[in-house]
Amino acid sequence: MQLTPHEQERLLIHVAADVAEKRRARGLKLNHPEAVALITSHILEGARDGRTVAELMSSGRKLLTRDDVMEGIPEMIHDVQVEATFPDGTKLVTVHDPIV
């Protein structure tokens, strides 16, 4: 399988998000990379599904709570920015303060 660097990066994000989701399902608190991967994957998949930027900005803030992540992680993640491909082109999605 021949993947471009961009495709490799997206695949790595989805694998990391899958690991994070499995850990969360087992009751483990997520670390910084796991939390960011989960939010990023949510945005990428939502864009692929045809959701709007506004919908993804809103739902990205509801994905994780302080109870889902290790102590101090919410303060470390101020914004998550993802360049996602929507049906009408590529757009930058920014989720401000994604963990409340």
From Swiss-Prot:
Top-level taxon of origin: Bacteria
Any single GO BP term: urea catabolic process
Keyword Hydrolase belongs to the record: yes
Record EC number: 3.5.1.5
UniProt entry tagged with the keyword Membrane: no
Alphabetical list of Pfam families matching this protein: Urease_gamma
Main subcellular location of this protein, as a coarse class: cytoplasm
Enzyme class: hydrolase
Key words of the record: Cytoplasm, Hydrolase
Recorded metabolic or biological pathway in which this protein acts: Nitrogen metabolism; urea degradation; CO(2) and NH(3) from urea (urease route): step 1/1
Subcellular location: Cytoplasm
CDD domains: Urease_gamma
GO MF annotation list: nickel cation binding; urease activity
Family (UniProt): Belongs to the urease gamma subunit family.
Protein name: Urease subunit gamma
Source organism: Streptomyces avermitilis (strain ATCC 31267 / DSM 46492 / JCM 5070 / NBRC 14893 / NCIMB 12804 / NRRL 8165 / MA-4680)
